[in-house]
């Protein structure tokens, strides 16, 4: 096989043909290694904690890793509920209060500091209680929502380990989309641009 002209010019005269083939092969391998080093770097520029940020509505440089990996902070799903009169908590305990269909629940800030996200339901209303310890913000979302394929689903949320302006970015396990707690909107993934309905929540004791 003929050696490309650009490469043959770079090879001094008098070198045996076998040696020139070795040089040619070495140049090809070097080029492949260089491409292998470049491609992962460009891909990692739009991926953080395993989330694809290529269609993010936010600048990916402003999305920061909070420390834990994806699901490094364990979100709760359908936690056990106990009556208020059986609760060992003091009356001064800070909680997020939820009222749906004349049913009342209190989610303690103490435990929300640990878990940040609680997926729960009252009758047919599925919802997610979210709390960002850095901002002190508690937001309640209705999670019965239409997906991009037109189907209806109950989104189940987890903690991404990512922050935007020091605020919690959740993700839904249904589509792996990232959601901003403050804007109640998907900022990347298949659900990008979709808004989550919010429900009243009370910061109280």
Residues of each region from the PLM?
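Hydrophobic transmembrane signal anchors and adjacent membrane-proximal interface regions, especially
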Residues: 1, 25, 29, 45, ...
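Intrinsically disordered, low-complexity segments enriched in Ser/Pro/Gly/Ala and basic residues
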Residues: 3, 7, 31, 41-43
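Intrinsically disordered, flexible peripheral segments
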Residues: 41-205
């Amino acid at each position: 096989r003929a050696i490309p002209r650009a490469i043959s010019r770079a090879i001094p005269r008098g070198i045996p043909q076998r040696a020139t083939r070795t040089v040619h092969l070495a140049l090809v391998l070097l080029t492949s290694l260089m491409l292998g080093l470049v491609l992962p770097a460009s891909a990692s520029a739009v991926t953080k904690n395993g989330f694809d940020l290529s269609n993010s509505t936010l600048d990916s440089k402003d999305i920061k890793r909070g420390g834990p990996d994806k699901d490094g902070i364990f979100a709760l799903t359908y936690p056990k509920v106990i009556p208020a009169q059986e609760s060992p908590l003091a009356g001064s305990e800070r909680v997020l209060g939820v009222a749906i269909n004349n049913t009342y629940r209190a989610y303690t800030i103490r435990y929300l500091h640990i878990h940040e996200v609680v997926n729960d339901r009252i009758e047919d209303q599925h919802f997610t209680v979210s709390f960002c310890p850095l901002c002190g913000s508690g937001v309640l979302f209705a999670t019965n929502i239409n997906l991009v394929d037109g189907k209806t689903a109950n989104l189940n949320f987890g903690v991404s380990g990512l922050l935007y302006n020091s605020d919690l970015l959740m993700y839904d396990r249904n589509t792996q989309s990232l959601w901003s707690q403050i804007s109640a909107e998907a900022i990347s993934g298949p659900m990008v641009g979709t808004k989550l309905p919010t429900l009243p929540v009370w910061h109280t004791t």
